[in-house]
Regions:
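Catalytic-core regions of core metabolic enzymes
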Residues: 1-122
Length: 122
């Protein structure tokens, strides 16, 4: 739930988790700003992806978030292969689908979320 996300992010940081993915939609912008400032000040080694993001996928290697693994084509030795960074979850899924239809592999796809205060930006 959006109200619980800030506390969960900070709990993960306090536990020493270095990479936190928050897929939760609807986290108030002021809470996002407070959490991001706290992470920068008190937990500089913790990287936040999100909130309101689909996460990160490296087909065949890892999938952290809510991106369906079948939607992305595996990277190939011969290529072509691409990486994707996107603010829109829907457009991320569409890009993955279109690339797979054209036999273009994806090395890594990162959805950073479209909220005003993303934990990770371009």
């Amino acid at each position: 739930p959006p109200k619980a996300a800030p506390a969960a992010i900070l709990e993960a940081a306090r536990a020493g988790i270095g990479f936190v993915v928050c897929i939760t939609e609807g986290v108030p912008a002021q809470d996002e700003a407070r959490v991001f400032a706290t992470l920068q000040r008190d937990f500089p080694k913790t990287r936040l992806l999100g909130p309101n993001c689909p996460g990160i996928i490296s087909p065949g290697k890892c999938n952290i978030g809510i991106t369906a693994g079948e939607i992305a084509a595996l990277p190939t030795a011969k290529g072509p292969n691409v990486g994707i960074v996107s603010r829109s979850g829907t457009l991320t899924y569409q890009a993955l689908y279109e690339l797979k239809q054209r036999n273009i592999g994806v090395s890594t796809c990162v959805g950073i979320g479209g909220d005003p205060v993303p934990g990770t930006s371009f």
